[in-house]
Design a protein with these regions (language model features):
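TRAFAC-class small GTPase G-domain
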Residues: 1-182
Length: 182
């Protein structure tokens, strides 16, 4: 019977003390966007991730925050959809494969093109340099330079090096995201 009252109390508290955040996860193909969503929702990383077609939507509860997460495909034919799924969100997460430095120029172009859309004015940006468990990955200062993050004005911008596979730095990423909740 005490379990019933505990559940009732948790449900009731959630009505008054819970927060929400809507997040869009974008980036070039094979950067780790879906792995990011999978790891934060289930705590599990898998090598067998099917490329996203168009988008996936997930709701994830972490502590007292419920995240509505748009995982948007990164292939060139889907990039024109990014703005639609970033409109009205509390934060944009841009995932970069930090081991594939040949794609940094393309990633920079796509990121700045997205952020120049008037509908995204002021939306906080979190850049994740994924795959830091692999030798030769670019450190944060290289990501900041290559993606020209210092040129981004009028919005909070943060950049972290992380690994979905080892879950390195995902705790601080989740703290950052929770800070965008309301």
């Amino acid at each position: 019977m005490s379990g019933f009252f505990t559940n009732l109390f948790q449900w009731f508290s959630g009505l008054f003390f819970s927060k929400k955040a809507e997040i869009s996860v974008v980036g070039l193909q094979a950067s780790g966007k879906t792995s990011f969503v999978n790891v934060i929702s289930s705590g599990q990383w898998s090598e067998d991730v099917v490329p996203t077609v168009a988008f996936n939507l997930r709701k994830v509860r972490k502590g007292n925050v419920t995240f509505k997460i748009w995982d948007v495909a990164g292939q060139p034919k889907f990039r024109s959809m990014w703005e639609r799924y970033c409109h009205g969100v509390d934060a944009v997460v841009f995932v970069v494969d930090s081991t594939d430095q040949e794609k940094f120029e393309s990633a920079r172009f796509e990121l700045h093109s997205l952020l120049n859309q008037p509908a995204l004015s002021g939306v906080p940006l979190l850049v994740l340099g994924n795959k830091n468990d692999i030798d030769g990955h670019a450190p944060v200062n290289e990501l900041i330079r290559s993606l020209e993050l210092s040129k981004i004005q009028g919005r909070p911008v943060s950049c972290y090096s992380c690994s979905m596979k080892s879950q390195h730095n995902l705790d601080i990423v989740m703290q950052w995201l929770a800070g965008r909740s309301h």
